[in-house]
């Protein structure tokens, strides 16, 4: 069937709007479709072969506005840092799930775009006994398993972010850096006590994630600075965590409110409580 053990048919058709027969026949039809294994190795090898040895740089001049525009593709985190120092107002783009809408809906025309998909240092996931560290360029689909191991509610939250195509493109770092008040990940990460690492040139700084959001549309990031990674502490056995997303539709919809609660118990006594919310103000907060 078109659904598999790792990807149920319900996930495949997530966001489908049915206005006639109901979802039962759609699910039945999906489960009845035979699926044979597909080898994409040759296609992937061909696409990887198109990658250039040197970073692809495109410069153009807009004669109507007199503006020079740049497309830059660093291959290392050092190149990225240098490019952002040289172009401090550049937009960093990973999956483009937000910036694409800014261009098509708001008619935004950034002077410089820096694509980070080939920066290996931003595409790492590190786990140890105490922390999970996710690079800013890691896509939701790639982070899903590690987040689900951290706590099942985190895995379920990620599964409800957009559709599969969005999760295959969008990144957790982008969800944080863009500062949307209805971003799904920040409330959960704030409740868990996550910390953010930022970089400007060769300088790093770390802050609690909740301090990154100042007010609507404004984050604690100077021009030329970028999000490098987010560190999520591993919950201890005495913690209880619950994460809930409310939206008009279950799948592929923005949050009306996203709530995350982390309680630390000492026996039957709550010693610490962290409650974080998104969608209720100009920034996610606790």
Predicted feature residues:
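C-terminal structural segment of proteins
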Residues: 1-286
């Amino acid at each position: 069937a078109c659904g598999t053990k790792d990807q149920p048919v319900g996930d495949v058709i997530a966001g489908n709007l049915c206005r006639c027969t109901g979802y039962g026949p759609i699910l039945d039809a999906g489960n009845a479709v035979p699926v044979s294994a597909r080898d994409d190795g040759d296609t992937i090898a061909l696409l990887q072969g198109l990658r250039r040895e040197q970073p692809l740089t495109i410069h153009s001049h807009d004669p109507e506005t007199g503006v020079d525009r740049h497309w830059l593709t660093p291959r290392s985190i050092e190149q990225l840092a240098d490019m952002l120092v040289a172009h401090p107002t550049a937009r960093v783009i990973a999956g483009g799930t937000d910036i694409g809408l800014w261009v098509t809906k708001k008619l935004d025309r950034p002077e410089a775009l820096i694509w980070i998909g080939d920066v290996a240092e931003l595409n790492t996931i590190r786990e140890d006994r105490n922390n999970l560290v996710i690079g800013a360029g890691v896509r939701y689909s790639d982070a899903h398993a590690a987040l689900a191991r951290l706590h099942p509610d985190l895995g379920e939250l990620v599964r409800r972010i957009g559709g599969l195509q969005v999760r295959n493109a969008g990144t957790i770092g982008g969800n944080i850096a863009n500062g949307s008040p209805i971003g799904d990940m920040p409330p959960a990460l704030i409740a868990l006590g996550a910390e953010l690492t930022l970089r400007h040139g060769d300088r790093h700084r770390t802050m609690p994630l909740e301090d990154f959001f100042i007010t609507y549309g404004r984050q604690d990031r100077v021009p030329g600075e970028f999000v490098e990674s987010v560190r999520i502490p591993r919950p201890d056995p005495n913690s209880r965590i619950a994460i809930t997303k409310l939206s008009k539709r279950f799948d592929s919809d923005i949050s009306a409110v996203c709530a995350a609660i982390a309680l630390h118990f000492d026996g039957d006594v709550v010693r610490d409580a962290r409650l974080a919310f998104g969608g209720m103000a100009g920034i996610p907060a606790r």
